[in-house]
């Protein structure tokens, strides 16, 4: 059921700020209602787009609680929890109130440039400490290290609570390899708005989008039509959005 609920269009929401530097909760409420009314399938909080790395611990708690209360069960919620310190990320997962959330999105370790075995061991530790399903997040343009197809597939096969990968490598050969050899039920999610349609046509399950929060109806319709096999309408919507 959870795997099904996280297909389609997820939105990695921004964290709006006031001029003085605090979180703009009025703006955040408007954004949440806007994307829900636009028909998106689920919402991702504290991802890269949400500027999680610059939020204080108190701000993260305030934002995740506010989102949970505002959404109030209308859409599944995913919380971003990641970092390059395996012990620290594991402790954060164990000590965070995850009630009301359906999964964790965890970016691969950055800066340290771990080996593939190091990446595997990192996620193995997170899997052991997480009460929620985990979505791997591969974005080598930001982390400086790629999760190879082999490592993604190894994690997908070895740990039942690692249920998906958000793939933002831009490497279509790698992505197709994951799609071809993934275990049943493992989701492949686009992490690149511009590659969403070709990835779905290759067998991917949807997207965690940024631009979709500005155009939630158009973007979620594009994904929905593509997943249903209506390429003509999906292509038309894609071309109308490609300039953004």
Could you describe each region identified by the protein language model?
Residues 3-11, 15-144:
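Active-site beta->alpha loop and helix N-cap motifs at the rims of alpha/beta catalytic domains
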Residues 242-244:
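Conserved small/polar residues in nucleotide/adenosyl-binding loops
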């Amino acid at each position: 059921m959870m795997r099904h609920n996280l297909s389609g269009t997820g939105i990695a929401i921004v964290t709006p700020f006031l001029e003085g530097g605090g979180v703009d909760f009025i703006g955040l409420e408007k954004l949440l209602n806007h994307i829900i009314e636009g028909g998106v399938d689920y919402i991702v909080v504290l991802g890269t787009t949400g500027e999680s790395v610059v939020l204080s611990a108190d701000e993260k708690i305030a934002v995740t609680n506010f989102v949970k209360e505002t959404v109030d069960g209308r859409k599944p919620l995913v919380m971003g929890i990641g970092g390059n310190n395996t012990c620290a990320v594991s402790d954060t997962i164990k000590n965070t109130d995850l009630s009301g959330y359906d999964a964790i999105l965890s970016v691969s370790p950055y800066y340290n440039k771990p080996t593939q075995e190091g990446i595997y061991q990192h996620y193995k530790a997170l899997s052991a400490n997480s009460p929620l399903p985990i979505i791997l997040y591969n974005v080598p343009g930001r982390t400086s290290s790629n999760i190879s197809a082999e490592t993604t597939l190894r994690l997908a096969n070895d740990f039942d609570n690692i249920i998906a990968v958000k793939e933002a490598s831009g490497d279509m050969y790698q992505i197709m390899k994951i799609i071809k050899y993934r275990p049943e039920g493992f989701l492949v999610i686009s992490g690149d708005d511009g590659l969403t349609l070709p990835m779905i046509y290759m067998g991917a399950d949807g997207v965690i989008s940024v631009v979709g929060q500005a155009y939630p109806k158009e973007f979620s319709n594009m994904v929905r039509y593509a997943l249903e096999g209506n390429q003509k309408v999906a292509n038309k919507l894609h071309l109308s959005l490609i300039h953004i």
